[in-house]
């Protein structure tokens, strides 16, 4: 069976509560909108005997969806995440001659009490770049708005199956407690070398990055 999307989630035995909460939400969406033949979920759970890079590579190899997306077991996603994405993919022939390389959507980032929106753009760099007239004359974000930034599509966006063979490699990290902090970034640099030409954009907040409480995140 060829699914439209493959959702790839690495986890750990010690993270079963977070993982079960996430999976419950995904399967409720799949059941509600009858998407069992369109959405594939692949997970690898271990006791840290397999590196995070290796787990993500293994799941990419196993995936059969037209597009794949990497999520973490503590990620938050919208209540209509699966429905929105599947509906968008099914309508792609209406507004795209060829299948796009990437399907992107917005991320809400919660960091140390602050809030901002990250929008994907193929012409953006891997760093956050302010978009729109949000900066005051002093170079600060204007008060009363949620700032928006452009960034190259991150791993929570959907990548065409042709990128399945773009694999991760272990990277050196300057932070001993975060050994994988550059793995995702280096993978995206490899994706860039494949020269993605088209991105289809869904204007909704599909993913939430919650770093208000760093203790709730994990380094696998």
What are these regions (language model features)?
Residues 75-88:
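Acidic donor-binding/catalytic loop of UDP-sugar-dependent glycosyltransferases
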Residues 47-63:
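Glycine-rich, basic loop-to-helix element that forms the pyrophosphate-binding segment
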Residues 103-121:
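Short beta-strand-to-loop element that shapes/binds the nucleotide-sugar donor at the catalytic cleft/hinge
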Residues 92-108:
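A short, conserved acidic/glycine-rich loop-to-beta-strand motif
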Residues 9-30:
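Short, well-formed alpha-helical segments that are part of the catalytic scaffolds
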Residues 68:
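Short aromatic/hydrophobic "clamp" motif used to bind/position activated sugar donors
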Residues 180-187:
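Acidic donor-binding loop at a coil-to-helix junction in glycosyltransferase catalytic cores
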Residues 110-116, 202-220:
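Active-site donor/metal-binding and catalytic loop motifs
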């Amino acid at each position: 069976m060829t699914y439209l999307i493959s959702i790839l989630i690495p986890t750990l035995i010690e993270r079963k509560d977070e993982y079960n909460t996430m999976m419950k939400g995904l399967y409720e969406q799949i059941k509600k909108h009858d998407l069992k033949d369109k959405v594939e979920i692949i997970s690898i759970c271990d006791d840290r005997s397999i590196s995070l890079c290796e787990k993500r590579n293994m799941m990419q190899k196993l995936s059969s969806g037209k597009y794949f997306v990497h999520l973490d077991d503590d990620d938050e996603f919208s209540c209509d995440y699966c429905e929105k994405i599947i509906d968008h993919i099914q309508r792609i022939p209406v507004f795209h001659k060829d299948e796009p390389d990437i399907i992107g959507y917005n991320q809400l980032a919660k960091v140390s009490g602050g809030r901002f929106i990250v929008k994907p753009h193929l012409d953006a760099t891997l760093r956050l770049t302010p978009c729109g007239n949000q900066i005051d004359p002093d170079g600060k974000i204007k008060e009363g708005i949620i700032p928006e930034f452009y960034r190259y599509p991150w791993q929570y966006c959907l990548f065409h199956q042709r990128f399945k063979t773009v694999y991760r490699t272990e990277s050196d990290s300057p932070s001993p407690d975060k050994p994988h902090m550059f793995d995702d970034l280096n993978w995206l640099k490899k994706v860039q070398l494949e020269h993605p030409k088209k991105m289809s954009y869904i204007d909704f907040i599909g993913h939430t990055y919650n770093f208000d409480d760093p203790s709730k995140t994990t380094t696998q």
